[in-house]
Amino acid sequence: RVQKYVHNLKSKLDAKTKNVKLHILRSDGGLASARSAEDFPVNLLMSGPAGGVTGALWVAVRAGFPNLLTVDVGGTSTDVALINNGQPRLRRETTVGDVTVRASSVDIRTVGAGGGSIAHVPELTGALRVGPQSAGADPGPAAYGKGGVEPTVTDANVVLGYLPEQQKL
């Protein structure tokens, strides 16, 4: 499937531009040629989360911050990674669910709580919990003004003043 996708993408780009060199982000934050991506798709497995870390690193180094903790809050999960001396920590293996493969990736830790995760207090424990239930994009958090009524992480950030109340989210 990756081979077909990359082939189609290259064909469309070639039809629209001249001499384009397609590169695709790898799980370790580096770039793969189109051919390498087709031949070794396992190296792309965690490229999405690696992209957040790579983008944060690009900005941080130019701003003079070579050491940082990156936090990427999505709708249902939050990814955290450590950058030390301008280099993200790497892992030799990548695990998704119950499957582990020998492919390097940025060392990213994920928790199942994102902006749309619903906060609740279960009767059994009486303790505040966040997720795994999610408000989704529609209706979404109450702050979206689209009919969501259950409290989410995004709503808490609006109430705490971390996100502007007046701005359309």
Please place each PLM-identified region on the residue numbering.
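N-terminally biased helix-coil "hinge/interface" segments that flank
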Residues: 1-169
